[in-house]
């Protein structure tokens, strides 16, 4: 073994890239370390493409091993199971910047596997995994127009931009941004922020790109020392005769089809034209395959749409570059639910529902850095009917998890603190129609549904997706892109925020040469679009509802003496269990005596409050209580008048007349009203029944005159 090791300083961290010692049968393998966090990144590429392969089969798998943090997995099987949401999101984070760097026409299968084998608790391994993947691809010899660098950026007003901040530093940061790019271009941005202005966000992107050049340089040096020979791969030659034939016979018809503004009608017409082209050019006796015809047909579609946009002609649906599609905003659309909204923008529609629960409904997340609870969940569902198709239903896909997380980032900064609003919140966005930017429709719908549920958001949030078409003779930034514009364009740029600033920014770029000017233009257009959408939303609901829905759980916090906690819980939990069973409420008790009570309705809540007040109540001199006789003795009776509290009614306090036998007046189990007369220094309570009885009328006549 002759391992090659490359070390370099990256901000406050030392990065180590090592190859040639582990996983030597992979096409490329690098053990990347950042401090005490290590990720083994491997790349395997198939030397030959599968016959008939017409797309690039790239798969990226990021996996966190429990042993990396010195843990044993939970569960019955005690081994890692299906990917967690964090693993899925990081897999997408690695995939997005590397995918556009493989050359057009390269359809050999490539698999990237990143395994976290050692982890510090205060460092997210994702940046280390991205750097390791870049290095593994660079030394593999697989055709790849890299390498890439990656950086996480934080921001505080006091310190400015922070490079690769730890979890502790991020806790006080107003920004959490991940940027990836090559030596010359930014390729991907993923971020959440606390209402930061556009210039700060753009500055963070440029700062990250500048700092990541250290990574690009180090990976290039590693590839020079340890790289394998570059594959002898050439793209298939263009069949110019086929291109010319399709242009001559179908270019005009395709152009007319792209004037049809209705998505389904447009798709039907294009499908019809595609079938005609296949029948005409790939029929019997032809050496041209159906796939070849469809591929060239698709490129012709792309060229037609792009050239029109750059030339300033109307877009597919007739809009100019800055117009947002017609909006329709509704709230309170569903009965029984806690909050709901229907947000429609053109042919994209999201039905969003907000549900409130108790603290115990929070999601428990067992991560490498330790276990924590999450009291806000946003789930995004994209059923096949939303695009008029039949399709697979079942487990949540990577795309749905990624879009849900983006929508969550947009809204999360505006949520109230847990001590102000102690509910667990779950938002579900059902995409019922889709033609572009359903994740941003989910942001708008989530904001509306949460306000409809009475959640005190700091400000309403809206989101918009921007696109880009860039040609040699100019570029056009498109506001509120359609699905076709996303597919045929060069950039997907999503911005969510309030009227005051940006809360989430996601950018995926398919080409090099995106300049600062283009990003500035996109952010400026996105701001105008966001303010327009917010004005439409505010016309329907501008403030959170003053009270929660009647269907939402009711909540009350009370403080008790910590010494009383054991009385509320009871022996083996019997008392608290009886309260929850009788009232239907759920109760959480903190060690400091804070009691949080959640009831399904007002009656449930009040019932639980009353029971706890009874249990924790202290006897007060002069107060009247309803009690039950629990024991009779010669000198009086003991009466239970509060949970766990008995007092003595002395024989002299039973009646106004002289009492010879207590049993003539009282029986065990009898309910009586008693008045608290005194509590001595030893805590013994003296009660009286006599004090509550009417005074007897005096007998005997008046004096004679």
UniProtKB/Swiss-Prot annotation:
Q: What does this protein need as cofactor? A: Mg(2+)
Q: Which Gene3D superfamilies match?
A: GHMP Kinase, N-terminal domain, K Homology domain, type 1, Nucleic acid-binding proteins
Q: Which gene encodes it?
A: pnp
Xref: PROSITE patterns: KH_TYPE_1 (PS50084), S1 (PS50126)
InterPro entries listed in its UniProt record? ExoRNase_PH_dom1 (IPR001247), ExoRNase_PH_dom2 (IPR015847), ExoRNase_PH_dom2_sf (IPR036345), KH_dom (IPR004087), KH_dom_type_1 (IPR004088), KH_dom_type_1_sf (IPR036612), NA-bd_OB-fold (IPR012340), PNPase (IPR012162)
Q: Which reaction does it catalyse?
A: RNA(n+1) + phosphate = RNA(n) + a ribonucleoside 5'-diphosphate
The KH domain, residue ranges: 553-612
Q: Which UniProt keywords apply?
A: Cytoplasm, Magnesium, Metal-binding, Nucleotidyltransferase, RNA-binding, Transferase
Q: What is this protein called?
A: Polyribonucleotide nucleotidyltransferase
Q: What positions does the domain S1 motif occupy? A: 622-690
Q: Does the keyword Magnesium apply?
A: yes
Enumerate the Gene Ontology biological process terms.
Answer: mRNA catabolic process; RNA processing
């Amino acid at each position: 073994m002759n391992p090659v090791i490359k070390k370099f300083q990256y901000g406050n961290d030392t990065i180590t890239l090592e190859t040639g010692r582990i996983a030597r049968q992979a096409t490329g393998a690098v053990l990347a370390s950042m401090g005490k966090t290590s990720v083994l990144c491997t790349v395997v590429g198939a030397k030959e493409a599968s016959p008939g392969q017409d797309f690039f089969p790239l798969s990226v798998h990021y996996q966190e091993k429990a042993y990396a943090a010195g843990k044993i997995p939970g569960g019955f099987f005690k081994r890692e199971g299906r990917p967690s949401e964090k693993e899925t999101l990081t897999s997408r984070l690695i995939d997005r910047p590397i995918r556009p760097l493989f050359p057009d026409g390269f359809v050999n299968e490539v698999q990237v596997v990143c395994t976290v084998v050692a982890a510090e608790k205060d460092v997210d391994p994702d940046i280390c995994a991205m750097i390791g993947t870049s290095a593994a691809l660079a030394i593999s010899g697989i055709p790849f127009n890299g390498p890439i660098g990656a950086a996480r950026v934080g921001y505080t007003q006091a310190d400015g931009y922070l490079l690769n901040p730890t979890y502790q530093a991020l806790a006080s940061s107003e920004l959490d941004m991940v940027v990836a790019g090559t030596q010359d271009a930014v390729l991907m941005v993923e971020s959440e922020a606390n209402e930061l202005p556009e210039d700060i966000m753009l500055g963070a992107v440029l700062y990250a790109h500048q700092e990541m050049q250290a990574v690009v340089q180090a990976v290039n040096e590693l590839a020079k020392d340890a790289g394998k020979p570059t594959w002898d791969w050439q793209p298939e030659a263009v069949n110019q005769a086929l291109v010319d034939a399709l242009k001559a016979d179908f270019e005009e018809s395709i152009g007319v089809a792209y004037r049809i503004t209705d998505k389904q009608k447009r798709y039907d017409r294009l499908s019809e034209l595609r079938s005609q082209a296949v029948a005409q050019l790939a029929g019997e006796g032809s050496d041209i395959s159906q796939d070849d015809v469809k591929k060239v047909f698709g490129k012709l579609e792309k060229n037609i749409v792009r050239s029109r946009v750059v030339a300033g002609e109307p877009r597919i649906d007739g809009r100019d570059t800055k117009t947002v599609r017609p909006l329709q905003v509704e709230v309170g659309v569903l009965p029984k639910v806690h909050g709901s909204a229907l947000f429609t923008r053109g042919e994209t529609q999201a039905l969003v529902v907000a549900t409130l629960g108790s603290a115990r409904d929070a999601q428990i997340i067992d991560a490498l850095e330790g276990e924590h609870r999450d009291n806000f969940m946003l789930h995004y569902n994209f059923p096949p009917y939303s695009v008029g198709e039949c399709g697979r239903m079942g487990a949540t896909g990577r795309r749905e998890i990624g879009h849900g997380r983006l929508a969550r980032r947009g809204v999360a900064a505006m949520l109230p603190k847990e001590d102000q609003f102690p509910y667990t919140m779950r938002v579900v966005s059902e995409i019922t129609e889709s033609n572009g930017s359903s994740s941003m429709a989910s942001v708008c719908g989530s904001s509306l549904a949460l306000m409809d549920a009475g959640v005190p958001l700091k400000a309403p949030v809206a989101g918009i997706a921007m696109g880009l078409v860039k040609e040699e003779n100019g570029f056009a930034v498109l506001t509120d892109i359609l699905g076709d514009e996303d597919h045929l364009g060069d950039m997907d740029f999503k911005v969510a925020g309030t009227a005051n600033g940006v809360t989430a920014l996601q950018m995926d770029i398919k080409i090099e040469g995106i300049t600062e000017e283009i990003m500035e233009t996109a952010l400026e257009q996105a701001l105008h679009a966001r303010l327009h959408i917010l004005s439409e939303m505010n016309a329907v609901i501008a403030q959170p509802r003053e009270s929660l829905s009647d269907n939402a759980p009711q909540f009350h916090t009370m403080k008790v003496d910590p010494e009383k906690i054991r009385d509320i819980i009871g022996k083996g939990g019997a008392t608290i269990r009886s309260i929850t069973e009788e009232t239907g409420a759920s109760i959480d008790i903190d060690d400091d005596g804070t009691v949080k009570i959640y009831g399904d309705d007002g009656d449930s809540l009040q019932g639980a409050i009353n029971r706890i007040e009874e249990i924790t109540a202290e006897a007060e001199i002069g107060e009247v209580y309803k009690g039950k006789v629990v024991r009779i003795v010669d000198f009086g009776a003991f009466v239970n008048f509060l949970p766990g509290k008995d007092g003595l009614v002395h024989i002299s306090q039973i009646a106004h007349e002289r009492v010879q036998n207590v049993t003539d007046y009282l029986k065990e189990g009898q309910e009586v009203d008693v008045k608290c007369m005194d509590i001595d220094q030893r805590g013994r309570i003296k009660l009286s029944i006599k004090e509550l009885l009417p005074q007897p009328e005096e007998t005997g006549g008046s004096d004679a005159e």
